[in-house]
Design a protein with these regions (language model features):
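Periplasmic polypeptide-binding modules associated with outer-membrane biogenesis and secretion
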Residues: 1-326, 335, 349-364, 369, ...
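Outer-membrane beta-barrel channels and translocator barrels
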Residues: 289, 313-315, 327, 341-343, ...
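Solvent-exposed loop/turn segments connecting transmembrane beta-strands
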Residues: 299-300, 323-331, 350-361, 388-396, ...
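Feature captures outer-membrane beta-barrel proteins of Gram-negative bacteria and organelles
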Residues: 332-340, 359-371, 377-379, 399-409, ...
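C-terminal outer-membrane beta-barrel translocator/porin domains of Gram-negative envelope proteins
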Residues: 285, 325, 432-577, 581-585, ...
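Transmembrane beta-barrel wall of Gram-negative outer-membrane proteins
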Residues: 361-444, 450-452
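Transmembrane beta-strand segments that form the barrel wall of outer-membrane beta-barrel proteins
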Residues: 263, 315-326, 332-355, 363, ...
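Outer-envelope beta-barrel architecture signal
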Residues: 304, 314-318, 330, 344-348, ...
């Protein structure tokens, strides 16, 4: 009530002028709409006092319920998938796979979504994109939001050069800059991108700094000719400015040090303009601020005050999802996450992941390793119960306590290093069927595990990547202990997706090897298996070495490749349906003790499927037919999944 009275004063509601009253009601409606209340009913009554020439105004406000988003529709996006655009905008719909999504409708959020979409299109080379939004109000107090998109033509980088009019560069610097520009233009994809312009600008800046040039600015100038864009980097010397004071505003919850550790400067340091964008990007990457503004206040004599104003955002989230499928059965996921725990910038996450054959409980926290660095340190407790009774005649409970560091090695390459303390408890479910090494390990086994991981990805968003590459490498070392033989395990995963017109071609390969450090048998759960998602037409643990149907052994070496062709069979569909045709190949071999059934032979399958991104989540149906198999393999020619995105790729 107090806030509404304040608005009446601001709007000068001091008499019974009908226009003033109408304006006041209109403004109150706008305020309610900004909070998602679009079904507000406002009426008023007058009580006039002739003796004093005054009156009382009584407003009756029926707020109603918050308006919800029913559907989000994209029209005209012929070259960028709905899922990619959906991942960019803040407006969300509620589905079975994200039942805790905030689907409140707010006009200003939709207006910001248009800005985000335009920015995304420009960054992907579409400089002429025009986006209009239409809101359909339903009688159920829900809305359908339609984004009408005219993508326009895609622009390409044509010529990139630089200008050194003040001759501050030497021959060595010139050669280095020319080399990185040449590498940039030799790329396969030269679509215009603001991010790529800034990245190349940063690379040039790094060359200058590494060669002892500290005070400069680089202006990125653009010249457009038809659909070709020429870029010129103008390199100029500047007089250094020194930071007298750094002021931080708006962080009512977040501690100052969380912001200061992301800054590239301290009081007394020289500062130049390119640093301001980098500081803003580093603060934005924390994912705890809605808006960031940095202003230089010039004090004269080459001194400046740096004013950083942030607007904090909600950093806590609840997630939940359900899925059902042939491989995992009924699965449920629930989690809590806070990205700014008590204003420290630390993230805390609790996750429960259960399925028919697996229950997993995880508690994890992540923070910066040291002040003024980009390395994150994490601590994790994990407990997993796995049921291998049908495949290998044992159950396995694993308790893990671990810590690790992670950081960006390059803009799209992440590196992580983890060390874990594992307690494994093997429980034999069938003594006559379980393998000898599993029976010998029955009970608790203790080990230390060191993991080293590299990850590179240019894949787009969505339940099915359209374009891009993924390369990952994992090296795992288990130290020998009194209850563990120890091993070295290496896994390389390669994925390539290419979109040609409406067709999507992909090839995915996984290569693995594990070696015992004591020349002993590797435990079954540490070996590689073949079947299921990576070899369709075969059951999980369906192909490869085994003693019996319920005693799968696995192998020390793995090579598997998936070839896929997908095509959207309905144009302009809000929920895309894709036809998929595939051909899989897999080979699993080598064990110290030869299993009863093991011939080291190649397995292969072909098949087709339907992938449907439905209102309740992704749905996949697959029919696989083995071409090359063995009599002892376990086939599964039909697979389905509802709600599991990972299963589709």
């Amino acid at each position: 009530d107090e806030e509404l009275l304040e608005y009446s004063k601001e709007l000068n509601l001091v008499n019974l002028n009908p226009l003033y009253i109408k304006n006041y009601i209109s403004e109150i409606n706008n305020i309610y709409e900004s909070f998602g209340y679009n079904d507000v009913d406002i009426s008023y009554s007058e009580n006039i006092y002739p003796d004093t020439n005054t009156a009382d105004l009584s407003f009756v406000i029926i707020e109603g319920k918050i308006t919800k988003i029913n559907k989000i529709i994209f029209i005209g996006n012929d070259n960028i998938a709905d899922e990619n655009l959906q991942s960019i905008i803040k407006s969300k719909t509620k589905t079975l796979k994200n039942i805790f999504a905030n689907n409140n409708f707010k006009k200003f959020v939709v207006e910001n979504d248009v800005r985000l979409l335009n920015k995304y299109y420009v960054n992907n080379g579409y400089l002429d994109t025009n986006i209009e939004v239409n809101i359909e109000y339903l009688k159920t107090n829900k809305v359908n939001i339609t984004f009408n998109i005219e993508e326009g033509k895609i622009y390409q980088f044509s010529l990139i050069d630089y200008l050194d009019s003040k001759n501050i560069l030497n021959n060595n610097i010139n050669n280095e800059i020319k080399k990185i520009i040449e590498i940039f233009l030799d790329r396969k994809n030269n679509d215009y991108s603001v991010e790529e312009i800034n990245k190349l600008k940063d690379d040039i800046s790094n060359i200058l700094v590494e060669n002892g040039i500290d005070y400069f600015e680089i202006q990125a100038l653009e010249k457009i000719d038809n659909q070709n864009v020429n870029i010129r980097y103008n390199i100029l010397p500047i007089e250094p400015k020194y930071t007298r004071q750094i002021n931080i505003y708006g962080n009512s919850r977040t501690y100052d040090y969380v912001i200061r550790r992301e800054l590239l400067v301290s009081e007394g340091d020289a500062i130049y303009e390119s640093q301001l964008d980098e500081i803003k990007n580093k603060l934005r990457s924390l994912n705890i601020f809605e808006n960031i503004k940095i202003v230089e206040n010039d004090l004269g004599n080459n001194l400046v005050d740096l004013d950083i104003t942030v607007k904090e955002k909600q950093t806590g989230s609840v997630s939940a999802g359900l899925s059902i499928g042939s491989i995992d059965g009924l699965a449920a996921v629930a989690g809590l996450k806070e990205n700014n725990f008590y204003g420290t910038g630390r993230s805390v996450e609790a996750l429960i992941n259960t399925s028919d054959n697996k229950q997993q409980y995880t508690l994890k926290t992540t923070d910066r390793l040291f002040y003024e660095n980009d390395v994150d340190v994490s601590y994790q407790i994990n407990y997993v119960e796995q049921d291998f009774s049908k495949a290998s005649s044992y159950n396995l409970d694993t308790f893990t306590v671990g810590t690790g560091i992670s950081y960006k090695l390059y803009p799209k390459i992440n590196h992580s290093l983890d060390i874990d303390y594992n307690i494994k408890d093997y429980q034999i479910t069938n003594q006559s069927k379980a393998s000898t090494n599993i029976k010998n390990s029955s009970g608790q086994n203790v080990s230390f595990v060191l993991s080293n991981n590299l990850f590179y990805s240019t894949l787009g968003y969505g339940f099915l990547p359209r374009d891009g590459n993924l390369v990952s490498y994992s090296n795992v070392i288990e130290t020998p202990t009194s209850s563990s033989n120890g091993y070295v395990k290496n896994i390389i995963t390669l994925k390539n997706f290419n979109k040609v017109n409406k067709n999507i071609y992909s090839i995915q390969t996984k290569i693995g090897n594990i070696i015992s450090l004591n020349n002993n048998d590797i435990l079954t759960d540490d070996k590689f298996s073949l079947g299921g998602r990576w070899l369709r037409g075969f059951d999980s643990f369906g192909a490869g070495p085994r003693d019996s149907r319920s005693s799968y052994i696995g192998g020390n070496n793995l090579i598997v490749t998936k070839l896929d062709f997908s095509r959207n069979i309905f144009d302009n569909s809000e929920f895309p349906v894709l036809l998929n045709v595939f051909n899989d190949y897999g080979l699993l071999w080598e064990n110290k003790t030869k299993p009863t059934n093991s011939d080291n032979s190649l397995r292969s399958s072909v098949g087709f499927g339907i992938r449907y991104y439905s209102p309740i989540g992704p749905i996949g149906l697959t029919w696989g037919f083995p071409l090359m198999d063995e009599d002892y393999d376990i086939k599964r020619m039909f697979l389905f999944s509802v709600g599991n995105i990972d299963w589709l790729n």
